Amino acid sequence: MLTEVKNQLKVMFLSLKYNIMRQMTNKVTFITNIVFMILNNASFIVQWIILFSIKEEIGGFTIKEVILLWGIAASTYGIAHLLFYKAFDLSELIINGKLDTFLVQPKNVFLSVITSDTSISAIGDLIYGYICLIIYGITIKNFLLFTIFSITGAIIITSLTSILGSLSFWIVKSDILADSFTNAMLNFATYPGNIFKNSVKIILYTIIPVGIANYMPIDIILNFNFISFVYIIIFTIVITILAFFIFNKGLKRYSSSNLMSSRI
């Protein structure tokens, strides 16, 4: 099993390498996309600087902690769109019967699909995330935790988006749900979790688990908690297994009719 996992990871990174090389054929566009994404992200921090000039704390966060929050959000989004870009187009691929080419490849279909393309601007998100970490204060501990949580956060958002996208095997318009979920995750991830109360906070730790992907990691970086750390790892593993299961379940339906004529 370990050999199979190793081979799948090797294939995934080879796919990433070739996708990036393909995008680098136009180096000016390649670099411009990355730089503009960094500048785009940085522009939002200006708004927070203005807010913190009026009030020292917002939701228990200082400006440095908000910058760290933005760093986690950006790097999470960056890794997800760099490695698993097609997970965010999964509904479109299923609805339009574009999985056929992946079915004949001698590797895991789900991984083949979601790693078949990359977003170059996501490199800018990833770089920006680590710039935020440097501004916050980089130490070996902070760097390791930040990297781990960027990966777990990326896997969580990719898995949940894939689950919603996989519903297109049964429901035609599930792409709307998947897009709404992705946008909600991104929007909530850039605000301190403590400003949300009661039912909204419950939703952010369950239905839209931005609390697990972003808020809990910030708390752990600020004040390490081993139980919370293990909880995030377990949640990430469970949601990943669920994403594979639902996609493979739906794939059997797709294999029987690639036109998906029997969907609702």
Locate the predicted segments by residue:
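Hydrophobic transmembrane alpha-helices and immediately adjacent juxtamembrane helices
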Residues: M1-Y136, I140, L144-I264
